[in-house]
């Protein structure tokens, strides 16, 4: 029998869902992390050099890679999103999850955003999400 290696779903904690410094700055003005992945020493250099790395962003950024046939994703964060506002932890802000979930919705992909303090979450933990998806896949 042959089995697929395609994911059924994914559950992640505090993901950085874009590698695009312009998106990072728009979503979270005090973003300061990520440029080192492309050889930039500072975030200002990362932002200024964005045009030169657009092909890499298109190839590797989770946000850029979303397609209609992607599996469901669950993202959990330490607090609620606040798009366009400085964050205590800009590297792991729920702004990343909110914007990816919004983008996934435009492609028809299920994306569940969870954060500490969320009232009545569909799944309270990544494990709950994974179990529900894996049991449904049988």
Regions found by a protein language model. Give the residues of each.
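Residues at the C-termini of beta-strands that transition into short coil/loop
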Residues: 11-14, 36-39, 117
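Short amphipathic alpha-helices and their capping/turn segments at secondary-structure boundaries
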Residues: 2-7, 58-68
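Noncatalytic linker/hinge segments flanking ATPase motor cores
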Residues: 16-19, 49-59, 112-121
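Primarily recognizes the serine-hydrolase "nucleophile elbow" in alpha/beta-hydrolase
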Residues: 1-28
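Hydrophobic beta-strand segments of well-ordered beta-sheets in folded domains
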Residues: 10, 71-74
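C-terminal catalytic histidine-bearing segment of alpha/beta-hydrolase fold enzymes
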Residues: 73-88, 94-138
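Mobile cap/lid helix-loop segments that gate and shape the active-site cleft of serine hydrolases
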Residues: 21-65, 92
């Amino acid at each position: 029998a042959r089995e697929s290696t395609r994911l059924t779903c994914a559950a992640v904690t505090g993901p950085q869902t874009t590698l695009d410094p312009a998106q990072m700055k728009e979503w979270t003005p005090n973003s300061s992390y990520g440029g080192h992945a492309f050889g930039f020493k500072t975030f200002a250099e990362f932002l200024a050099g964005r045009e030169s790395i657009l092909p890499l962003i298109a190839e590797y950024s989770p946000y850029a890679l979303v397609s209609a046939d992607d599996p469901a994703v669950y993202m959990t964060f330490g607090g609620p999103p606040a798009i366009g506002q400085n964050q205590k932890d800009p590297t792991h802000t729920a702004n990343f999850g909110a914007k990816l979930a919004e983008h996934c919705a435009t492609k028809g992909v299920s994306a569940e955003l969870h954060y500490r303090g969320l009232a009545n979450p569909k799944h309270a933990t990544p494990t709950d999400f994974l179990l529900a998806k894996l049991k449904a896949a049988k």
